[in-house]
Amino acid sequence: MKKTLLTAALLLAALGAGAQESFVHERSNGYVWPTDPAVLEKLDQWQDLKFGVLMHWGLYSVPGIVESWNLCNDDWVVRPEGSTYEGYKQWYWGLSKVFNPVNFNPEQWADVFEDAGMKYMIFTTKHHDGFCMFDTQYTDFSVAKAGPFADNPKKDIAKYVFDAFRPKGFMIGAYFSKPDWHCEWFWNPYYATARRGINYKVSLHPDWWENYVTFTKNQLGEITGGRYGKLDILWLDGGWITGDQVGLNEILPEARRVSPGLICVDRTIKGPNENYQTPEQSIPKTQLANPWESCMTLGTDWGWTPNPRFKSARKVIGTLAEITAKGGSLALGVGPTPDGVIEEKAVVILKEIGAWLRRCGKAIYNTRITEHYNDGDIWFNISKDGQTLYAIYALPDGESLPATLTWTENIPKGQVTILNNGKKVKATVKDGQVTVKLPKGLADEPIALMFNLK
């Protein structure tokens, strides 16, 4: 069955679950501010960056299917016709024997995403399928041990990815799945596989669960303990394991001794370990006062799939403008190919985004929210010092630039600078409405304006 059908099923199931704002994963209904000054400082630095990349890469990339979820026994899952559940699982686990990214080139990734104007990165060290993209000593189900890439000098993939991005000034983030469907202490083979959660009662098998907690703490210790350098973000997925059930309160103090100010993102789990919220594949309806990030895909899926349908550069820029005007950041999902490169179609779009940001990035980076933040397709940000206002016209796909831009409130003082070409124009104000006449010759792209307020 084609991957797009599976993705559609996932979206329909999630959107029908009663989430108020139509997120694939509903964001937490509250926020607890950190008390550690180093974490608060790191969060403020992260909020300056605005634009990052979230890379899913693993066994699912080999056939180009949805990441891990075909293993799940949820009702929405669609597997190839005629395959049995157990047969499918064995086929999927067997992908570990053929995953061989011989063209693995993290330096190319770093170049591409730097050129796109991205400032932070998050890499999947382990997804729900349990396949580790780092050299762990606690399971052989890893790229460093299970298949042909185990003989490659770059077999500790996460290390080489992080090392490629650090010299370029990226904040470094490690994605880690709290559930592990390959681990016998999570899905124990004695029982049939339940849906996404553990398939046994902890009250009957407390030792199994304790083994799983120890296993998870050990792996998180490997990632955060210094072997992979200082981390800026620990991005934990699988919020259906709730609270502190995997020992985060024990892990984080040691992790923050190695990486002071480490931002912990315990997704969808309201509490002190969710340092920023992560609405998925959607944007909150209004501004949020707390730190947050929309994680959204460039295509339709997180991992690489054949013949992807990518968003246009114009669409991504408009999305970024809306997100930043509402106080958030954008983590854009781009999945490397099975052999280890970023495909050319994605590179072309990312280059276009980066070219716009090099001219207009002042309107995005190092900005904060302003009270009047939206007027139709125009989104407003203000500089961190509160002195300069920015207006971004998010030109919709398929449309040409209008001759004028108009909005209410946010009245300019003096001339308005068009960041796209550096030219200054006058703004006229009548009955509280601002009108800016655009000069001829501008490209059909989002327009960023800079001005001071009266």
Each PLM stretch: what is its role?
Residues 1-4, 113:
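Positively charged n-region of N-terminal signal peptides that target proteins for export
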Residues 20-454:
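Mature catalytic domains of secreted/periplasmic carbohydrate-active enzymes
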Residues 10-18:
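Hydrophobic h-region of N-terminal signal peptides that target proteins for export
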Residues 7:
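Short, surface-exposed linear motifs at loops/turns and structural transition points
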